[in-house]
Amino acid sequence: MLPFRTFLLALVCLLPLGVFAAPDDGGPVYELRTYTAAPGRLPDVLARFRDHTIAIFKRHGMESVGYWVPTDAKDGAGGKLVYILRHPSREAAKKAWAEFRVDPEWQAVSKASEANGKIVVKTESVFLAPTDFSMLK
């Protein structure tokens, strides 16, 4: 029994880690973002994206993949925006967000859209690397 266990342990140790996780090779990364709107303010969040934010993202090299709203109450229907951005690399994402935050147009749009209070109360971000079998690369 011991030789079999030793064989299994050796096999597991020799498996390349790349089989289990996509490498961070500087290639494209996707950013999954979820915004929770202040109560009753999702229409304001959507309008800000539709009318301003997407164009500002584009100007800073942030590629929009898609935008969605949950359809089930348990997932935040009526109060959340979920979207995905594509960045050339993690470093490019960091740079783009830094530039976006100080963009004069963004600052004006943000201030104007929040004249009656904050419209986003929670922001979540997850960076994702495509697997070797992903249609998005």
Region locations from a protein language model:
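N-terminal secretory signal peptides that target proteins for export/translocation
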Residues: 1-3
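Bacterial N-terminal signal peptides
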Residues: 6-18
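An amphipathic, aromatic/His-enriched active-site/gating alpha helix that lines ligand/cofactor pockets
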Residues: 23-26, 47-65, 77, 86-127
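Surface-exposed interaction/gating patches
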Residues: 25-46, 52, 56, 130-137
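Solvent-exposed beta-strand motifs enriched in subsets of small alpha/beta binding domains
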Residues: 34, 83-85
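Solvent-exposed loop/turn segments at secondary-structure junctions
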Residues: 70-74, 88-92, 131-133
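A short, glycine/Asx- and small/polar-enriched loop/turn
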Residues: 75-81
